[in-house]
Amino acid sequence: MDSLARQSAKICPFVSRVTSSMQQVQVLHKTNMSAMAQQCPVMRRAMAARGYVTASPPAGAAAADVGEARPITPVLERGTQERTFDYDGLFETELQKKRLDSSYRFFNNINRLAKEYPMAHRLEEEDKVTVWCSNDYLTYSRNEKVMETMKRTIDKYGAGAGGTRNIAGHNRHAMRLEAELAALHKKEGALVFSSCFVANDAVLSLLGQKMPNMVIFSDEMNHASMIMGIKHANVQKHIFRHNDLQHLEELLAMYPKSQPKLIAFESVYSMSGSVADIRKICDLAEKYGALTFLDEVHSVGLYGPHGAGVAEHLDFEAHRKAGLASPAQTTVLDRVDMITATLGKSFGSVGGYLAASEKLVDFVRSYAPGFIFTSSLPPAVMAGSAAAVFDQRSSLHLRQLQQKHTSYVKTGLGDLGIPVQPNPSHIVPVLVGNPDLAKRASDILMEKHRIYVQAINFPTVPRGTERLRITPTPGHTNDLSDVLLDAMDDVWKTLQLPRVSDWAAHGGLLGVGEPDYVPEANLWTEEQMSLTNDDLHPSVFSPVEKFLEVSSGIKA
């Protein structure tokens, strides 16, 4: 203790000031160190922040504090003339940066009309526009079955869940939804989160924190939620070039197979429409001993015979014939360790989820703060989401109609020479290449043509690749598409925006006008597009009845 006191006197100016000898320090320690520590500006704050195992202090703690309390004269008082930090000034400076680089966001007041989809009104209900950029890909937000299910549920169970899943917020709606999601992806378990942003952040950060020496490999175009989760994981990470599997393998080869590794990527990248080679990524994961973390946010509902996403689509026939059962052979869907996705796009409501093995789901359920310490989704939301997942599973025609409308728009824009970034998916990214012009193009579409298409600028996309992002749905008929095409042609003429030939004259960009670019074939083949709901397995037309044990907790 003498050694500790000597060290304290050397390090702490407070100790050296209030003690004239080491004997005094020793006496201080033995008699009244607690009271003296309260006079130290550092220790006073540290002692005020007491920790307890429970959420509240143990009984008697407050009384003990009162018994030890003594009148304290502050040792150090700040000068009354010292200026307060200019908080508003900092906020304004940061906002001005975004205005100057054209990344400041303006929100459009868009109120989508369920009975007039894809119409919406702005501030005034008579001021109507056609929405062409919603992520409600299959229009389930206004599906009659979904809305009726939500109405019945809210009438019976009220507006909110009442708490976290651990405290009063766990119910049959959560269990039914998780059973449907696990069945959709043919995984042992599923776990519902308040959003897929939260799911990605919670799962990735937890795995990094719990696995010793984990290394994460992330596609450079991954969503902000995955980037945030990887940052919170606080582990070694490598960013591989977008869809560049040679680069990914070079990075994986740097580490022994026994070291924990995870590859994080998306199936469909929402701002470009590019698609990952999931099969080859699984090959690399197995070769180098890595887990696979696949975000299917922009593909669930849209790909595969049952809407499970691109991983299912890659073995389309095997899954179509097997229905809810797993095919006899190993599929890409089997090989992906973790799938995350959203309830807020193709399924029309809100929320996110993880589908994985029972042990992994139970691990996340038991340890992830982003799941544990947040209120459960409302019963009506979960019931409506389960109804949407079930209904779309047997609605092959909706997926096909969305693909047909997308193809019509892409072909029409191509005929006009309007530059669409080529891709094999349902996304229609129209290249502008300038943030101010992209914003003006969006404004003209809205004000002159009553068409809402959002401009996409930095930081969502790299500078110089600014674009308009169009997302046709089953509700966007060919007649509506013709109106859009005429409006786009007018905007390109008005603003004298570069067409495909103009991009080609400068060497091209992002596949637009690039002389050696070879476009990928669409994910949906003509044979798949010719199928009907009658070609689906009978098992997909019945809801999943059995709840998952992992949803409530597995009994030892």
Curated annotation (Swiss-Prot):
**Which amino acids does the record list as binding pyridoxal 5'-phosphate?**
S270, H298, T342, T374, S375
UniProt name for this protein: 5-aminolevulinate synthase, mitochondrial
Subunit composition? Answer: Homodimer.
Subcellular location(s) per record: Mitochondrion matrix
Q: Which InterPro entries match?
A: 4pyrrol_synth_NH2levulA_synth, Aminotrans_II_pyridoxalP_BS, Aminotransferase_I/II_large, AON_synthase_class-II, PyrdxlP-dep_Trfase, PyrdxlP-dep_Trfase_major, PyrdxlP-dep_Trfase_small
What is its cofactor? pyridoxal 5'-phosphate
EC numbers on record:
2.3.1.37
